[in-house]
């Protein structure tokens, strides 16, 4: 979990647009972010394995 201060600081608008970056809204993680699902890889894996994200199926071949 990200520190509360970092999460709050991220919500403020940056002076320069280039400095903005994505954060997971669930845990606040900045790395491993999946744009398509708007969350980090860890939260995605947890929710996908629990069948809470519609349309996501575990692949097997």
Curated annotation (Swiss-Prot):
One Pfam family cited in the UniProt record for this chain: Ribosomal_S14
Record InterPro entries: Ribosomal_uS14, Ribosomal_uS14_bact, Ribosomal_uS14_CS, Ribosomal_uS14_sf
Keyword Ribosomal protein carried by entry: yes
GO function terms (MF aspect): rRNA binding; structural constituent of ribosome; zinc ion binding
Cofactor binding note from Swiss-Prot or TrEMBL: Binds 1 zinc ion per subunit.
Keywords per UniProt: Metal-binding, Ribonucleoprotein, Ribosomal protein, RNA-binding, rRNA-binding, Zinc
Keyword Zinc belongs to the record: yes
Family annotation (PROSITE patterns): RIBOSOMAL_S14
Binding site for Zn(2+): 24, 27, 40, 43
Entry's transmembrane regions: none
GO cellular component: cytoplasm; small ribosomal subunit
Domain of life: Bacteria
Recorded family membership: Belongs to the universal ribosomal protein uS14 family. Zinc-binding uS14 subfamily.
Function: Binds 16S rRNA, required for the assembly of 30S particles and may also be responsible for determining the conformation of the 16S rRNA at the A site.
Quaternary structure and interacting proteins, as annotated: Part of the 30S ribosomal subunit. Contacts proteins S3 and S10.
Protein name: Small ribosomal subunit protein uS14
Gene: rpsZ
């Amino acid at each position: 979990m990200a520190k509360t201060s970092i999460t709050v600081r991220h919500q403020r608008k940056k002076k320069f647009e280039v400095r903005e970056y994505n954060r997971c809204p669930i845990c606040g993680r900045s790395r491993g972010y999946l744009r398509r699902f708007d969350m980090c890889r860890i939260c995605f894996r947890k929710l996908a394995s629990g069948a809470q994200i519609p349309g996501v199926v575990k692949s097997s071949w």
